[in-house]
Protein backbone atom coordinates (compact mmCIF):
# COMPACT_ATOMS: atom_id res chain seq x y z
CA UNK A 1 0.00 0.00 0.00
CA UNK A 2 2.63 2.51 1.07
CA UNK A 3 4.87 1.85 -1.92
CA UNK A 4 1.89 2.27 -4.24
CA UNK A 5 1.10 5.63 -2.61
CA UNK A 6 4.70 6.80 -3.07
CA UNK A 7 4.67 5.72 -6.72
CA UNK A 8 1.39 7.55 -7.31
CA UNK A 9 2.69 10.73 -5.65
CA UNK A 10 5.87 10.54 -7.72
CA UNK A 11 3.99 10.13 -11.00
CA UNK A 12 1.08 12.46 -10.30
CA UNK A 13 2.94 15.28 -8.53
CA UNK A 14 6.73 15.08 -8.42
CA UNK A 15 7.62 14.27 -12.04
CA UNK A 16 5.02 16.61 -13.61
CA UNK A 17 6.22 19.46 -11.38
CA UNK A 18 9.91 18.76 -12.06
CA UNK A 19 9.47 18.34 -15.83
CA UNK A 20 6.68 20.90 -16.23
CA UNK A 21 4.33 18.28 -17.70
CA UNK A 22 0.65 18.73 -18.40
CA UNK A 23 -1.98 16.68 -16.59
CA UNK A 24 -2.62 14.73 -19.80
CA UNK A 25 1.07 13.86 -20.12
CA UNK A 26 1.18 12.83 -16.45
CA UNK A 27 -1.67 10.39 -17.16
CA UNK A 28 0.31 8.96 -20.07
CA UNK A 29 3.31 8.64 -17.77
CA UNK A 30 1.18 6.56 -15.41
CA UNK A 31 -0.02 4.38 -18.30
CA UNK A 32 3.57 3.96 -19.47
CA UNK A 33 4.64 2.74 -16.03
CA UNK A 34 1.71 0.28 -16.03
CA UNK A 35 2.85 -1.08 -19.42
CA UNK A 36 6.41 -1.44 -18.14
CA UNK A 37 5.27 -3.08 -14.88
CA UNK A 38 3.30 -5.76 -16.74
CA UNK A 39 6.17 -6.61 -19.08
CA UNK A 40 9.47 -5.83 -17.31
CA UNK A 41 12.12 -6.69 -18.13
CA UNK A 42 11.47 -6.28 -21.82
CA UNK A 43 13.01 -4.93 -25.00
CA UNK A 44 11.13 -1.70 -25.63
CA UNK A 45 9.63 -0.91 -29.00
CA UNK A 46 9.28 2.84 -28.55
CA UNK A 47 7.16 3.22 -31.69
CA UNK A 48 4.68 0.55 -30.57
CA UNK A 49 4.46 1.95 -27.03
CA UNK A 50 4.06 5.44 -28.48
CA UNK A 51 1.14 4.16 -30.56
CA UNK A 52 -0.54 2.73 -27.46
CA UNK A 53 -0.16 6.03 -25.61
CA UNK A 54 -0.73 8.24 -28.66
CA UNK A 55 2.62 10.04 -28.38
CA UNK A 56 5.79 10.02 -30.49
CA UNK A 57 8.56 7.50 -29.94
CA UNK A 58 10.84 10.38 -28.88
CA UNK A 59 8.32 11.38 -26.21
CA UNK A 60 8.33 7.80 -24.89
CA UNK A 61 12.12 7.90 -24.59
CA UNK A 62 11.87 11.21 -22.72
CA UNK A 63 9.16 9.89 -20.37
CA UNK A 64 11.32 6.83 -19.65
CA UNK A 65 14.19 9.13 -18.66
CA UNK A 66 11.86 10.89 -16.18
CA UNK A 67 10.78 7.53 -14.74
CA UNK A 68 14.41 6.46 -14.46
CA UNK A 69 15.49 9.70 -12.74
CA UNK A 70 12.60 9.25 -10.30
CA UNK A 71 13.88 5.78 -9.37
CA UNK A 72 10.93 3.86 -10.81
CA UNK A 73 12.65 2.09 -13.72
CA UNK A 74 16.15 1.18 -14.87
CA UNK A 75 17.12 1.25 -18.53
CA UNK A 76 19.77 -1.25 -19.59
CA UNK A 77 21.59 0.15 -22.60
CA UNK A 78 23.80 -1.39 -25.24
CA UNK A 79 27.50 -0.63 -25.02
CA UNK A 80 27.65 0.69 -28.60
CA UNK A 81 29.03 4.13 -29.13
CA UNK A 82 31.41 4.00 -26.18
CA UNK A 83 29.36 6.38 -24.04
CA UNK A 84 26.59 4.70 -22.05
CA UNK A 85 24.23 7.62 -22.46
CA UNK A 86 24.33 7.24 -26.23
CA UNK A 87 23.68 3.50 -26.20
CA UNK A 88 20.30 2.25 -27.34
CA UNK A 89 17.94 1.06 -24.61
CA UNK A 90 18.01 -2.73 -24.81
CA UNK A 91 15.84 -3.62 -21.80
CA UNK A 92 13.69 -1.79 -19.30
CA UNK A 93 13.46 -3.08 -15.72
CA UNK A 94 11.44 -1.86 -12.79
CA UNK A 95 13.95 -0.16 -10.52
CA UNK A 96 13.84 -2.64 -7.66
CA UNK A 97 12.24 -5.86 -6.50
CA UNK A 98 9.73 -4.13 -4.21
CA UNK A 99 8.26 -2.40 -7.26
CA UNK A 100 7.94 -5.76 -9.03
CA UNK A 101 5.71 -7.07 -6.27
CA UNK A 102 3.80 -3.78 -5.92
CA UNK A 103 3.18 -2.92 -9.58
CA UNK A 104 3.69 -6.16 -11.47
CA UNK A 105 1.67 -9.28 -12.04
CA UNK A 106 0.81 -11.58 -9.19
CA UNK A 107 2.77 -14.36 -10.92
CA UNK A 108 6.26 -12.93 -10.62
CA UNK A 109 8.99 -14.91 -12.35
CA UNK A 110 11.95 -15.51 -10.06
CA UNK A 111 14.35 -14.88 -12.97
CA UNK A 112 12.95 -11.36 -13.27
CA UNK A 113 13.48 -10.77 -9.56
CA UNK A 114 17.08 -12.03 -9.77
CA UNK A 115 17.99 -9.88 -12.77
CA UNK A 116 16.28 -6.81 -11.33
CA UNK A 117 18.11 -7.20 -8.03
CA UNK A 118 21.49 -7.65 -9.74
CA UNK A 119 20.96 -4.68 -12.07
CA UNK A 120 19.73 -2.46 -9.23
CA UNK A 121 22.68 -3.25 -6.99
CA UNK A 122 25.46 -3.05 -9.57
CA UNK A 123 24.42 0.07 -11.45
CA UNK A 124 24.82 2.22 -8.34
CA UNK A 125 28.61 1.73 -8.54
CA UNK A 126 29.39 0.55 -12.06
CA UNK A 127 28.60 1.08 -15.70
CA UNK A 128 26.18 -1.73 -16.56
CA UNK A 129 25.32 -2.51 -20.18
CA UNK A 130 24.04 -5.47 -22.15
CA UNK A 131 26.41 -8.29 -22.97
CA UNK A 132 26.35 -9.98 -26.37
CA UNK A 133 26.78 -13.40 -24.71
CA UNK A 134 25.04 -13.18 -21.34
CA UNK A 135 22.86 -10.96 -19.15
CA UNK A 136 25.13 -8.07 -18.17
CA UNK A 137 28.48 -6.45 -18.96
CA UNK A 138 30.02 -4.43 -16.14
CA UNK A 139 32.50 -1.63 -16.79
CA UNK A 140 33.00 -2.99 -20.29
CA UNK A 141 34.99 -6.04 -19.21
CA UNK A 142 33.19 -8.27 -16.68
CA UNK A 143 30.45 -10.52 -18.02
CA UNK A 144 27.73 -11.82 -15.69
CA UNK A 145 25.08 -14.47 -16.22
CA UNK A 146 22.40 -14.43 -13.49
CA UNK A 147 20.40 -17.53 -12.59
CA UNK A 148 19.32 -20.06 -10.02
CA UNK A 149 21.20 -22.74 -8.17
CA UNK A 150 21.40 -24.98 -11.25
CA UNK A 151 22.61 -22.29 -13.68
CA UNK A 152 25.33 -23.65 -15.97
CA UNK A 153 28.40 -21.93 -17.39
CA UNK A 154 27.92 -22.89 -21.04
CA UNK A 155 27.53 -19.31 -22.25
CA UNK A 156 30.68 -18.18 -20.46
CA UNK A 157 33.12 -20.98 -21.32
CA UNK A 158 35.17 -18.94 -23.79
CA UNK A 159 34.76 -15.60 -21.98
CA UNK A 160 37.59 -14.12 -19.97
CA UNK A 161 36.24 -12.39 -16.86
CA UNK A 162 32.95 -14.28 -17.14
CA UNK A 163 31.01 -14.97 -13.95
CA UNK A 164 27.88 -16.89 -13.05
CA UNK A 165 25.74 -15.30 -10.35
CA UNK A 166 23.60 -17.93 -8.63
CA UNK A 167 20.66 -17.51 -6.33
CA UNK A 168 19.97 -20.04 -3.57
CA UNK A 169 23.62 -20.77 -2.78
CA UNK A 170 25.41 -19.61 0.35
CA UNK A 171 28.95 -19.36 -0.95
CA UNK A 172 30.55 -19.08 -4.34
CA UNK A 173 33.58 -20.80 -5.79
CA UNK A 174 35.77 -20.21 -8.82
CA UNK A 175 33.84 -17.90 -11.13
CA UNK A 176 30.52 -18.51 -9.35
CA UNK A 177 29.23 -15.78 -7.04
CA UNK A 178 26.23 -15.86 -4.69
CA UNK A 179 23.55 -13.38 -5.73
CA UNK A 180 23.01 -12.16 -2.17
CA UNK A 181 26.57 -10.83 -2.06
CA UNK A 182 25.68 -8.10 -4.55
CA UNK A 183 23.38 -6.68 -1.89
CA UNK A 184 26.54 -5.66 -0.04
CA UNK A 185 27.52 -3.24 -2.82
CA UNK A 186 24.80 -0.75 -2.13
Residue spans for each PLM region:
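Short, solvent-exposed polar/charged micro-motifs at secondary-structure junctions
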Residues: 1, 137-142, 173-176
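Accessory nucleic acid-recognition modules appended to NTPase machines
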Residues: 2-134
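Short hydrophobic-aromatic micro-motifs
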Residues: 69, 93-94, 143-145, 164
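A broadly conserved detector of short glycine/acidic/proline-rich loop/turn motifs that flank catalytic sites
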Residues: 79, 98-99, 142, 148, ...
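A structural signal for short secondary-structure junctions
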Residues: 86, 137-138, 157-158
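Conserved catalytic cores of phosphodiester-cleaving nucleases, focusing on short active-site segments
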Residues: 122, 136-152
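A short pocket-lining beta-strand/turn micro-motif at the edge of beta-sheets
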Residues: 132-134, 142, 161
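Long, low-complexity, charge-rich intrinsically disordered regions
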Residues: 146-186
Amino acid sequence: QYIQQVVNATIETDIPQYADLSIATARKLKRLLAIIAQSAPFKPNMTQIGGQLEVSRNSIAELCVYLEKAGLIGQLRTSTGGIQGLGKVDKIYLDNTALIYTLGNRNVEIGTVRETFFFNQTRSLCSVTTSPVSDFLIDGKYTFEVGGKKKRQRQLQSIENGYVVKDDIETGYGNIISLWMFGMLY
